[in-house]
Amino acid sequence: MSEGDVARARAALAAFGTGDLDRLVRLFHPDFVGVVPPELSAEPDTYRGHAGIRRYVESFREYVDGLRFVPEDVIDAGDAVVVAMRIEGRGRGSGVPFEQRLANHITVRDGLIDSMTAYATIDEALAA
């Protein structure tokens, strides 16, 4: 990955928590595929295209206040970018804070995020 691709991955993760879906969607390829596996979510799913990005963010907003995606380590993994990160927020109804740590394996095509797959550990994401 180029430095520009690493910067795009950082920008995309930062944009998730801004609430600006139009800005976020512009960072993703129209053929984007995102995967959230069952071990990381009560509602695992595959998100496709710009509509998938919107659906993913809106599903969080329905239940979470103060949503933040916080990159902790960004690694140029050759043909991908791997980002160790945490997701933070508070339950909308309960106010209970939560934090989830994970690692994303991200690919870039034509200067846009093409795929993003979540893994439980950075080692799993690096091996993908």
Question: What is the predicted function of each stretch?
Answer:
Residues 1-128:
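C-terminal and inter-domain tail/linker signature
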